Amino acid sequence: MNLPQIFVEQMKEILGPELPEYLESYEKPKFTGLRVNTSKISVEEFERISPFKTLRRVPWTPNGYYYTEEDAPTKHPYYYAGLYYIQEPSAMTPASVLPIEEGERVLDLCAAPGGKATELGAKLNHTGLLVANDASASRTKALLKNLEVFGLPNILVTSEMGDKLDRYFHEYFDKILIDAPCSGEGMF
């Protein structure tokens, strides 16, 4: 894999002699996953109608599955109907472990492109309020698209810095998810 040189240099500083082993990991097959939209379909019903042959459960989330590229889930009508979201399995963890109860007011501070926000919204089960925020206005287009496809009506999308949101919503939320923006290295 041809990684950006600046990234390799940064990783060399961090990893030192372990860098070659780390770089080799980029040549191994990656894990790919999808997460069922439980606001539209139950996990059991999805398993019953799923055309995908290679699905395996992601052990740390009840509605996550590994798949292989031969299944091509992004080309299936179920994807466009919002029955599932394509999400790297480790990225399923934050929203999966945050205990959300129906009727709560929840903030996803760094929400784009919407993977975690769609899970939080599904856990609210059309109750309460989810404020899906991303400081980058350009990233909210993908966020809006994903939330719309998921059919979640109780969501407010904002594009503000966290300190400004605090002025408007001070002590308002029952739960806050901050999966702070990363470098995008997971996309390599």
Regions found by a protein language model. Name each.
Residues 1-188:
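S-adenosylmethionine
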